[in-house]
Amino acid sequence: MLGYACMNHTLRDREPPLRCNRDMRKATFEERGVAYASELALQNFEDLHAILAWNAANDVGFYRCSSTLVPWNSQFDLAALPDYEAIRAVAERCGALVEREGMRLTFHPDYWCRLGSDSADTRATSVDAVDYHADWLDLMGLARSPYYGINVHIGATYGDEAATAERFRDAVADLSPGARARLTVENDDTESLWSVPELVDALDGTDVPVLFDYHHHTFTDRGLTYREAFDRAAATWGAVRPAAHYSEPARLHGADARPQAHAEVPADVPAWLRARADVMIEAGGKEQAVFAVRDATTAP
């Protein structure tokens, strides 16, 4: 199946717009507190259900939800929210819809989530972030499996790849059971960072799958073809169907952009990748990119 991340342009442009990423600045949280966070979280879950229903009606089976689904969740327990019971009821409807329609729902915490950081404070904050993403999936009643993944990057080597890998593994051990069971790690888009084979070696013995990012592999190929790298990553998923990311460089489509920048709409997704993985299309066109790829694939 094919999917897109976070924003749905079709629904965002409606009145009122549908979106599940309502957030607030720190100053607003300090002023309005948990009550306002609860209000936003309830709205986000309600709109997540509407987005998932739209996806199902439009045969889009894969969706990455925003990491601001519950704003400022690092500052409170989910069950402490004033609207917790209402949020839980909507979350359960979201999970039931996902399961009924055979859909796949994942998360991708922000760039600052660094489980292998050389800062103990950053590692602790990152563990907390992955844990509360898992709490949201638990609230929806979705299985503790990388099928409903929480995807991260190791993101740096801090001058010592082996020590970073060890810190990452230690942080994985500190995760809650629900977070640890859903964690996935993807290859990076900078030559000096983490490639697929390096991740496979670093994660050996952790049961954490490696998620293959097609475009990122361009920058960290380590002499492997795209298929060879995917095979190495796919072997870490066990019985679970792998997830993968696909994007095309904006430069390929005529944009004056850095090599890592994504095109608004890719031309296509390789047939072999679609056959062997659920593919998240990372593109500014969001759901429209999925439709374009699907139309290109089915055209005579």
Where are these regions (language model features)?
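Alpha/beta catalytic barrel-like cores
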Residues: M1-R104, C113-L142, P146, D174, ...
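Active-site glycine-rich loop that binds ribose-phosphate moieties when present
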Residues: Y132, G159-D174, D189-W194
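Extended, charged catalytic domains and RNA/DNA-binding interfaces, predominantly
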Residues: G149, A156-D160, R169, R182, ...
